[in-house]
Amino acid sequence: MIVNVSSGMGSVAVTTDPGRFESTLIGLAYPASKTALNMITSQYAKAYPRMRINAVDPGYTATELNGHRGTKTVQEGAEVIVRMARLDASGPTGAFLDSEGSVPW
């Protein structure tokens, strides 16, 4: 079981959707690193099909990284991470998920 903590900022679809908050943000290193993590997740899931390897977006979580401006508590952000870490062998692999379901790549 591998749960990679990604972000909507790593999704080209999310960051180019004018209806999403993420489309208003400008960055280079953080979004690029999360996009790379998403590709690593996808490739590892294909290379190791017996493992559950997924990327999750905890949402805009109030942490030191954003000066505690996030709209979710750490407990709320951690929920999807913990849920995915508890998957059994029949759970998804190679997916990008948030608390509401699939996130577009």
Task: Kindly label every feature range from the protein language model.
Residues 1-49:
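Catalytic loop of short-chain dehydrogenase/reductase
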Residues 11, 58-64:
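Short, flexible catalytic-loop segment of classical short-chain dehydrogenase/reductase
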Residues 15-18, 55, 59:
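A generic structural signal for ordered alpha-helices
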Residues 21-24, 61, 80:
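Generic preference for well-ordered secondary structure
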Residues 25-28, 65, 69:
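Conserved short-loop catalytic and cofactor-binding motifs
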Residues 35-38, 51, 55-58, 67-105:
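C-terminal helical subdomain
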